A protein has these predicted regions:
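Patatin-like phospholipase
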Residues: 1-37, 45-282
C-alpha cells in the first residue's frame, strides 16, 4: 500500500508535525510521498531530503529562533512611511531570507540544490499574489498535470520553494519569482492532499490543527492579521478535506504563529496525540 502524508500550515504549530512523524516511524508506517504547506513545507521538505524526525526537530528550533526575529530596517521603513508618506511601504516584517538560507544549507549537505533533485515525491504549494494562481513546487517531472488552476515547477531551489510557501502575508515578504510575487500556500491550499491522491497514494494521512475558539485578550497588529488568516484557513479547511478519510487533528491551546517558546510542548503533543490515535491511522 502506498501511503501519502499531508502536513498543513500553522506557523510554530508545525513542530507538532515532527512529533507525529516520530510516532509514525516508531509504528513502522512508511511514507511514500509527502506534501506540506507553510510550516508543513519546512517539515515535509526536510523529511523528503532524508532527515530524521530528531534532526528535523533540532533544525525547526533553529528556524524558530531565526525567523521570529523582526528586521529592524523594515520597522524603520514602516515608521518612516507612516510618518512621512502616510502609507505602509514594506511588504512584511521579515524578509524570509534566513529561512531560505537555512533550508538551502541543509539541502547542500545532501547534495541537493533544486527541488527536482529530491528522490521522494514532494509537493509544496504557494500562491501568486497577483491573480491567486496556485504554484505547486514538486520533485516530480514538470509535465505532470494536476489541473488547469495549478502551475507546477521543479526547477526552483528547495529553500526558495519553502520560503515562498511560508510567506505569511504581512509577516514575511512575498518571494519574487519571474515577475510574480508568491505568498503562503495556506491562502488557497492549506491541506494539499488531493495532489498525493493523483500521485497514486492508496492511503493519505492529513495532519491538521484544531480551530481555536478563543483569542488572547491583549492583541497587536500581527495577532489581528494572523487571526484573520486562521479564520479564512479554517473556512477553507471545511472545503478542502471533503473526501479525505484519515485526518489527525492536533489540539494546540492558544498558540500564535511565532510563539517559539512552545516548540517543545507542540512537538510532544504531536507525538502523544498521534500515538493515541494510531488505531485510526493504521
Amino acid at each position: 500500500m502506498k501511503i501519502g502524508l499531508c502536513l498543513s500550515g500553522g506557523g510554530v504549530k508545525g513542530a507538532a508535525h515532527i512529533g507525529a512523524l516520530k510516532a509514525l516511524e516508531e509504528e513502522n508506517i512508511k511514507i511514500d510521498c509527502i506534501s506540506g504547506t507553510s510550516s508543513g513545507s519546512i517539515v515535509s521538505s526536510l523529511y523528503a531530503m532524508v532527515y530524521t524526525p530528531n534532526e528535523i526537530y533540532l533544525l525547526f528550533k533553529k528556524f524558530g529562533k531565526e525567523i521570529s526575529k523582526v528586521d529592524i530596517l523594515k520597522i524603520i521603513k514602516l515608521i518612516y512611511g507612516l510618518i512621512f508618506k502616510r502609507k505602509i511601504i514594506i511588504e512584511g516584517l521579515n524578509s524570509g531570507n534566513k529561512l531560505y538560507k537555512i533550508v538551502q544549507e541543509q539541502a547542500s549537505k545532501k547534495e541537493i540544490k533544486q527541488i527536482k533533485d529530491i528522490k521522494m515525491p514532494l509537493i509544496i504549494p504557494s500562491v501568486n499574489l497577483y491573480n491567486g494562481e496556485i504554484y505547486l513546487f514538486t520533485s516530480l517531472e514538470n509535465n505532470r498535470k494536476y489541473s488547469d488552476e495549478y502551475i507546477t515547477l521543479n526547477n526552483i531551489e528547495i529553500g526558495r520553494a519553502v520560503q515562498a510557501s511560508c510567506s505569511y502575508p504581512g509577516v514575511f515578504c512575498p518571494v519574487n519569482l519571474k515577475n510574480k510575487k508568491l505568498i503562503d500556500g495556506g491562502v488557497r491550499e492549506n491541506t494539499p492532499w488531493k495532489e498525493l491522491k493523483e500521485l497514486g497514494a492508496d492511503k493519505i494521512i492529513s495532519i491538521v490543527f484544531e480551530k481555536e475558539e478563543k483569542i488572547k485578550k491583549d492583541v497587536n497588529m500581527i495577532d489581528c492579521i494572523i487571526k484573520a488568516m486562521e479564520i479564512q484557513s479554517h473556512e477553507l479547511y471545511n472545503y478542502e478535506v471533503d473526501g479525505l478519510e484519515y485526518i489527525l487533528k492536533i489540539k494546540t491551546d492558544l498558540t500564535s504563529l511565532l510563539e517559539i517558546e512552545k516548540i517543545d510542548e507542540l512537538y510532544k503533543e504531536g507525538y502523544k496525540q498521534t500515538k493515541r490515535n494510531m488505531g485510526k491511522i493504521k
